[in-house]
Amino acid sequence: MYAVIKHGGKQYKVSVGDVLELDRIEGAEPKSSIELNEVLLVKGDDTKIGAPTVEGAKVVAEVINNARGKKVIIFKKRRRKDSRKKRGFRRDFTRVVIKEIVA
């Protein structure tokens, strides 16, 4: 059984036991449980497709930790103009493990 969920403007295909890195969820403590209610599709014995979401479906996940991703360097240069910009970016994310899919 798997489900397609929407979180943070992205879609994820998840099954029970999958580990995901979602955009930072404020107030999510490690070992706490969260519910993801924007379920777009559930596939098991039968398929349920939402319009836009499946009514009554949810995905239960357990928070593993909150962390920051690797640094990404953004470097812009205009040739012959002595113009340079260097910026760094680190993504904040919440790592979760999928515990249950309720259809």
UniProtKB/Swiss-Prot annotation:
GO terms for molecular function: rRNA binding; structural constituent of ribosome. HAMAP family: Ribosomal_bL21 (MF_01363). Keywords: Ribonucleoprotein, Ribosomal protein, RNA-binding, rRNA-binding. NCBIfam families: L21 (TIGR00061). GO terms for cellular component: cytoplasm; ribonucleoprotein complex; ribosome. It comes from Nautilia profundicola (strain ATCC BAA-1463 / DSM 18972 / AmH). Belongs to the bacterial ribosomal protein bL21 family. It comes from the Bacteria. The lineage of its organism: Bacteria, Pseudomonadati, Campylobacterota, Epsilonproteobacteria, Nautiliales. This is Large ribosomal subunit protein bL21. GO terms for biological process: translation. Transmembrane segments: none annotated. The keyword Ribonucleoprotein applies.
